Amino acid sequence: MSGATLEAYLASCTARGDDLSRDVAAVIQRLAKAALDIRKLVNQGALGTAFNGTHGGSNTDGDLQKDLDILCDDQFLTCLQGAPVACYASEELENPVLLDPSARLAVAIDPLDGSSNIDNNVSIGTIFSVLPAAKGPDVDPSQSFLQPGNRQLAAGFFIYGPQTALVLSLGKGTEIFIFSSRLGCFVEAYKSAIIPERAHEFAINMSNYRHWEEAIRLYVDDCLAGSEGPRERDFNMRWIASLVAETYRILIRGGIFLYPADGRKGYSQGRLRLVYEANPIAFIIENAGGAATTSIDRILDLVPENLHQRVPLVFGSRREVARITRYHVDPNMIGERAPLFGKRGLFRA
């Protein structure tokens, strides 16, 4: 059932707001316009000139940059020229770009999340965070991004899949808009999305089981044990390897997503980036009634140490996220498990 257009929704949200809220709305509309251009590039697939080319360099994550990654980054950076944005930070750039020092907003973005999966026609997307810009004489632009996620003014992601969608939170609920080809704009499809408290699905990359810490193994063992185990109900496992696709599914159907720290080289602090991946996703999830943590600590309370800091990420149905925290901090949680599901679990480490 369709609702307001994105433009009408933003107008209603800012009708009684201040200049800052109107600036946020202006930025979101510019991002939406750029996303529709990127949608066209993505939809060309292997027929597009940017699809198979590689840039020759690596991004801050060490991933080989595709031409499409660079094009998308340039597209968003260009669309924010002249917008009320002081500085722009991206996964594809080592340092923030200064735009308008007098502006009041900062934008952090993962321009094409999941681009390594594009050859497989998996849904990919753009994740963004809008923050108040740091102010002061000779302020370093990076300071705008070294503030906790609970200070975000807005966050969202575009997903380029069977439908092109925008998931958006301005801090009071989470809305889902679908692009209407007939109308040529985003239209509200799910108003005030609410994540079900009870989860029946979990998403994790099981191939890394042997590298996880014990609490994560035990949680997964208990889910896999199903109705015969301590959870006394069956679970399904999902793994798309696309953060935006996993998040979208959880918003619609509930469940939990886990990308924990593990014992592999480079993964001890987690893998996802706090500023432009974990923070915006956590903001969206919490405003839909869910929770997001590092397994222990609330994501939105973390103060970033640097722009590209990595963190573990667990999010989804509130009860399941809280349960994982208890597996980490409450020894009695392990002691209460049935003998069959003791520390060895269903798998040998």
UniProtKB/Swiss-Prot annotation:
Coiled coil: none annotated. Its EC number is 3.1.3.11. The lineage of its organism: Bacteria, Pseudomonadati, Pseudomonadota, Alphaproteobacteria, Hyphomicrobiales. It is found in: Cytoplasm. NCBIfam families: PRK09293.1-3, PRK09293.1-4. The keyword Magnesium applies. Keywords: Carbohydrate metabolism, Cytoplasm, Hydrolase, Magnesium, Metal-binding, Plasmid. One of its GO terms (molecular function) is magnesium ion binding. InterPro entries: FBPase_C_dom, FBPase_class-1, FBPase_N, FBPtase, Fructose_bisphosphatase_AS. GO terms for biological process: fructose 1,6-bisphosphate metabolic process; fructose 6-phosphate metabolic process; fructose metabolic process; gluconeogenesis; sucrose biosynthetic process. Its cofactor is Mg(2+). It catalyses: beta-D-fructose 1,6-bisphosphate + H2O = beta-D-fructose 6-phosphate + phosphate. It is an enzyme of class 3 (hydrolase). Pathway: Carbohydrate biosynthesis; gluconeogenesis. Belongs to the FBPase class 1 family. The keyword Magnesium applies. Mg(2+) 2 binds at residues 110, 113, 277. Mg(2+) 1 binds at residues 91, 110, 112. Substrate binds at residues 113-116, 205. This is Fructose-1,6-bisphosphatase class 1. Binds 2 magnesium ions per subunit. PANTHER family: FRUCTOSE-1,6-BISPHOSPHATASE-RELATED, SEDOHEPTULOSE-1,7-BISPHOSPHATASE, CHLOROPLASTIC.
